From Swiss-Prot:
This is Large ribosomal subunit protein eL21. Keywords: Ribonucleoprotein, Ribosomal protein. One of its GO terms (cellular component) is cytosolic large ribosomal subunit. The keyword DNA repair does not apply. GO terms for biological process: translation. InterPro entries: Ribosomal_eL21 (IPR001147), Ribosomal_eL21_arc (IPR022856), Ribosomal_eL21_CS (IPR018259), Ribosomal_eL21_sf (IPR036948), Translation_prot_SH3-like_sf (IPR008991). The gene is rpl21e. Coiled coil: none annotated. Residues 10-21 have a biased composition (Basic residues). GO terms for molecular function: structural constituent of ribosome. It holds the Pfam family Ribosomal_L21e. Residues 1-22 are annotated as: Disordered. It comes from the Archaea.
Length: 98
């Protein structure tokens, strides 16, 4: 039998794909977006940006911005019973409302 690969993007055929109208590069304002510490953000992975991409397990999660590391933001997310710190570029983060 063939052995299954265990890469970073495995089992993400639907999760890391764009709809035809969304294809192409992201707006530049999304890369220049700034977040303040303590702000709530949603992790929505943009598959066209490979740098600063969090693990697909955290796609759709909501967390709190803890700090900044270079161009990326550190987001505190609850995973099971633990809190984990995710390092992600602003292209993969959206401000949470309400």
């Amino acid at each position: 039998m063939v052995q299954m690969s265990e890469g970073f993007r495995r089992k993400t055929r639907k999760k890391l794909s764009k709809h035809p109208r969304e294809r192409g590069l992201y707006p530049i304002t999304r890369a220049l977006r700034e977040f303040k510490e303590g702000e709530y953000v949603h992790i929505v992975i943009d598959p066209s940006v490979h740098k600063g991409m969090p693990h697909p397990r955290f796609h759709g999660r909501t967390g709190i911005v803890v700090g900044k590391q270079g161009r990326a933001f550190i987001v505190k997310v609850r995973d099971g019973g633990k809190y984990k710190q995710i390092i992600a570029y602003p292209q993969h983060l959206r401000p949470a409302t309400a």
